[in-house]
Regions:
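Short alpha-helical linear motifs
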Residues: 37, 68-75
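N-terminal cationic and glycine-rich segments that engage phosphates or anionic surfaces
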Residues: 1-58
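Non-DNA-binding regulatory cores of transcription-related proteins
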Residues: 73-155
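Generic leucine side-chain signal with a strong bias for well-ordered alpha-helical environments
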Residues: 12, 16-19, 31, 63, ...
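Amphipathic alpha-helical coiled-coil segments
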Residues: 57-71
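Conserved NTP-handling cores and scaffolds of large molecular machines
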Residues: 20-23, 67-71, 131
Length: 155
């Protein structure tokens, strides 16, 4: 079971709708056109059309699986005093005295450029359930990170 924000669920549902209603029919039509051009063994256009159709089908199945096995998170039901899914947490790396802030999200919402880390990442997992002032330890490739929670907010 995966948990998604309402926004991310809607984005994935919209992508699925586009793929099913527009991209797949276009890919199937293109494949039929390329197939009608004769010898498939020497038809690069046919092979490319088939690759695009297979990629589209794969993405459709992937999105269907995510949406079928996901639940939308109710932000009002989340704790406000502990790090949880959708929490924006500011913390200090005690080894380097560096302050950072990230939002904890599901793996399907992770986007480092947008400041979103997965709850399954080493840092996300270590911070989950912590309160302000508590210290978490995360295992990273560079060694153990000691992180002190400075603030927690829900966006």
């Amino acid at each position: 079971m995966e948990y998604l924000s309402k926004q991310r669920y809607d984005e994935l549902a919209a992508e699925l709708k586009y793929l099913v209603n527009e991209a797949y029919p276009k890919a199937a039509e293109n494949l039929a056109e390329m197939s009608a051009q004769g010898d498939r063994s020497d038809n690069a256009g046919y092979r490319e059309a088939r690759r695009i159709q297979a990629k589209t089908i794969s993405r459709i199945r992937f999105l269907q699986n995510i949406l079928e096995h996901s639940r939308v998170i109710d932000p009002d039901a989340l704790p406000k005093d502990r790090v949880s899914l959708l929490s924006r947490v500011e913390f200090t790396n005690l080894s380097t005295n560096t302050r950072m802030a990230f939002q904890i999200v599901s793996p399907h919402e992770m986007d480092l450029e947008a400041g979103k880390i997965s709850l399954k990442s080493p840092i996300g997992a270590a911070l989950m359930g912590r309160k302000v002032g508590e210290i978490a330890e995360a295992q990273a490739p560079s060694g153990t990170l000691r992180l002190r929670v400075e603030s927690i907010t829900l966006d």
